[in-house]
């Protein structure tokens, strides 16, 4: 199949390898709740990056592969090893080979790895592509989707043994994450998510009445 090209917001976008990559992630994103973040996140990057000049191939690849190291079958099963696990370092090691098998442009791999290295809120993105990905990933941790992603980890993630652990994480997110957004577009997108997030926490506190456990 010849490489299909289109132009969106001034960016040259290729599609030939994308279906292969998305299918690889769909099959590897386990447990099942690990899938869904990737297509939602990519859709968010298009909104966050609207009007900016950037390489969408780089953002797409990083979006689908940045969390490779948190998938079952890729991360350690031993709880002590898992507590020390660096999922970013794992992804940086494995992603070049995966992209090569998908037929991705090898000249863009370094840019993809830069996005993956700096996609977390604590990181300092060094490119417009990594800034877009990081902002979009922060947005995915806020609002209704952010709440669902956190609560589904209770009893399945070593960080969330109880509902109180999840509530504390959600409270920390609404306090700390909005201020880490770099782009004005991201801040605008965050407003409704922040409202939903705060209303949920207030309702949770009222209904649990100190008995969330």
For each of these PLM feature ranges, what is it?
Residues 2-12, 27-54, 65, 75, ...:
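Divalent metal-dependent phosphate-bond-processing catalytic cores, especially two-metal-ion Mg2+/Mn2+ enzymes
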Residues 16, 20, 63, 111, ...:
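Generic alpha-helical secondary structure signal
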Residues 20-26:
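Short glycine/proline-rich turn/loop motifs
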Residues 41, 85-101:
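An active-site-proximal "capping" alpha-helix that borders the catalytic cofactor pocket
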Residues 55-56, 108:
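Membrane-helix interface segments
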Residues 56-76, 87, 91, 113-122:
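His-Asp-centered metal-binding catalytic motifs of divalent-metal-dependent phosphohydrolases/nucleases
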Residues 77-82:
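Short glycine-enriched, charge-decorated loop/helix-capping segments at active-site entrances
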Residues 103-110:
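Short, flexible active-site-proximal loops enriched in glycine and acidic residues
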């Amino acid at each position: 199949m010849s490489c299909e090209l289109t132009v969106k917001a001034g960016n040259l976008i290729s599609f030939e390898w994308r279906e292969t990559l998305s299918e690889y992630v769909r099959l590897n994103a386990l447990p099942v709740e690990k899938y869904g973040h990737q297509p939602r996140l990519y859709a968010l990057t298009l909104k966050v990056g609207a009007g900016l000049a950037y390489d969408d191939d780089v953002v797409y690849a990083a979006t689908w592969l940045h969390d490779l190291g948190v998938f079952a079958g890729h991360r350690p099963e031993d709880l002590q090893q898992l507590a020390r696990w660096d999922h970013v370092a794992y992804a940086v090691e494995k992603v070049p080979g995966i992209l090569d098998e998908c037929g991705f442009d090898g000249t863009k791999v370094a840019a993809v790895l830069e996005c993956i290295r700096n996609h977390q809120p604590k990181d300092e993105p060094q490119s417009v592509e990594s800034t877009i990905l990081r902002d979009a990933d922060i947005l995915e941790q806020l609002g209704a989707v952010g709440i669902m992603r956190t609560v589904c980890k209770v009893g399945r993630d070593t960080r969330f043994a109880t509902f109180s652990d999840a509530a504390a994480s959600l409270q920390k997110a609404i306090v700390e994450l909005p201020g880490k957004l770099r782009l004005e577009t991201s801040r605008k997108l965050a407003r409704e998510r922040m409202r939903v997030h705060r209303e949920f926490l207030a309702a949770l506190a009222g209904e649990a009445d100190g008995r969330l456990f």
